[in-house]
Amino acid sequence: DQADAVRRTVGHLLLYTPVVHPSDFDSAISYLIRRLEENASTENFLSGVFELTRSPHIFEREELRFRESLAAFEAAPGAPVAHRVQSRLAEQAFGSGPAGSAADVGVGARVDGGGELPEHAGVRAGFDNAADTDTAMPDNREWGRSILKSAQTTTRGQALVDASAVESGAAGVAAIERVVAETRLAGAAWAARSVDERSRILHAAGGMLSARRADLIEVMAAEAGKTLAEGDPEVSEAIDFAHYYAESMRELTRIDHAIFTPVQLTVVAPPWNFPVAIAAGGVLAALAAGSAVIIKPAPQTRRSAAVMVEALWDSGVPREVLRFVDAPENEVGRALIAHPAVDRLVLTGAWETAALFRSWRPDVPILAETSGKNAIIITPSADIDLAVADLVRSAFGHAGQKCSAASLAILVGSVATSARFERQLVDAVTTLRVGSALDATTVVGPLIEPAAGKLLGALTVLEEGEDWLVEPQPLDATGTLWSPGVRRGVVAGSAFHTTEYFGPVLGIMRARTLEEALELQNATPFGLTAGLHSLDPDEVGYWLDHVEAGNLYVNRGITGAIVRRQPFGGWKRSSVGGSTKAGGPSYVMGFGSFTPVVRTVRESLSLRGVSDGAREVLEASQPGLEFDGFDAVRAGAVSDQRAWDDEFGVARDDSQLGAEFGEIVERNVLRYRPTAVTVRAAERAPTYELVRVLLAAARAGARVDISSAIPLPASLLALISTGISSLRAASVVTETDARFTARTLEVRPARIRLIAPDGAAAARALHEALDGDPDVAIWSGVVTAAGRVELLPFLREQAVSLTAHRFGNPYPALAELAL
């Protein structure tokens, strides 16, 4: 009767129900339970539908709700406005990004009504992520179809590529010399512009990238084989970088006790797999800091980078400050990468590429995001259906050509023998639509180049004990189109366990326990992304405490990091140099150096504002310090505590997804973890600078190995020897510079904080002695009292993204888990 009544009124009624084979009935259970739970809720009229004619109370409840809804509608100025109103066609016709973006409401707009941001607010008060395209809207689907049609014949960016080509040989090297000299000179003028002016230009750049979303997706589809679903969020990321760095650069002027000076010249060498977002990220961060930029695009995606650069030029970035140079991959490219006038080199690519660049110039100041061998652990307490969906999406998006892609699944306990898991995985993988990026229905697009070398081996050759659960197949004669593959039986230490392949192939490993699975996950040389699927809060907590990666994901996919929400960057060989996370609060700091602010000495011995741990170290060091040095160290200890309270000692979720509706649905937390560092005080280094750096290490809780050319104060050594000091010194060695260098060649510590009268020269000599070893990162900046600066070498950033709901309903077990 109800169905007939609805049909008579609206003319059409759709009835739907899950249809499954009897043996797969459990696959429908979760859906049916969600519907039952939803319909049984007292907020839903269906909960009383069978009692309306029998219960006056239920009838009156529903009558009251109905009349109240009519009254609310009549009181409103009009019909309720739809929330989903995005129209890329309308935006395109208007010639701008979405209404309300920073580009439309005025660059540098503040959500707090204007004026200066509060201290330590950073970008938290004035930044919102760009919205990806809502493909449920008819206008947007029409917009997408027009992009794919244009992509068939597009030549966007080609004119700039042709005009920027550098020839090979001596003439090309000479051209590089001219470009470097001219751009470096322009960098000085760019740095001289005010922070407000540079910020306005970057906000305008974000608006221009938004306006050219279609152009950027078009050229990426044509040149890089990116589907609409992959290209659209990449443009959003580029837009986010512009607005985020436009605001985070302001923090550089608010750091206490230190003055920031940008480097003059940065070279950006982006990858082909994210030719717009990652290229834009490096360029925009350098520009935000005040550095001029030369971008050398990846040979496979020159036009995509060119269209991005043209958008930045058209938004107000001076052409002499941002240079597009298409240098060949020979001695000319080497002349640019290894040029002594290059102050920063931003690289995203293989660890081996970073090693190659360091072999050309051992001291090249590299900020690199490198390789990943990423795994998702799935435990028996996981939601198997969701785990499979996230695993497949993470493994085969962009044909697996992401450094963050899941190339391993580690199945714990009964999951490893689960017929249901295997059946779901095979079904999900074999039903992925593989094809051209110019086909709107394609899910897995082509490889950037024909499969060759180690990738071809991964797609065609099994190791001993392995077999194909789903065997990959070449689908055309080009060698670029492959159906996804899944290999079983991958064992610890095998090539597939530890090697990055960068293609559509997934390996399956088995573990008896979560602890064993973690050992497998942590056993690779890399630490970029890592995932866990488990609904058990104890398992999640244990995993979060022990996993070794920069970006962690719980009960969701492990790709698609979003600016600010999940700042991106890895541990171990997934990162080279002293870099911090892209899209995070410290990234722009890497494009310059800090010098101490001239301070007035406090005529007091008071230690107010100094933490208890720092107090004991400072008091033990006091006999070896002049009063000026003591005062500088004390100021540093106070600043350390402030930085700890504001940034490093808190696990903060700036995005607060769902908070406006009363429930956090996804927790995105940036936290900091202490890491081991070798602290070296070179010959003629002041004792107070060593003590100041050790105080930063103590506040961070980092384990340190101390090497000093002069003996430490006896009282400080005595404190260290107790083993209960906040200064966690594993060793203390007094030695010459020559002896330290010789010992470093043997030990090769991952991080060195180098204190020397000429830190740059000392670091250069050490890098050369190490032959540019990319596994060793050296911090050699002038020692300051700024805790926001000095704590960074002793901490590793870690971004945690955790799904805090179950099908839209809050899941307190994970929503309230301490992070």
Language-model-derived ranges and their functions:
Residues 201-202, 216-220, 224, 228-231, ...:
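Extended, hydrophobic alpha-helical segments in both membrane/secreted and soluble proteins
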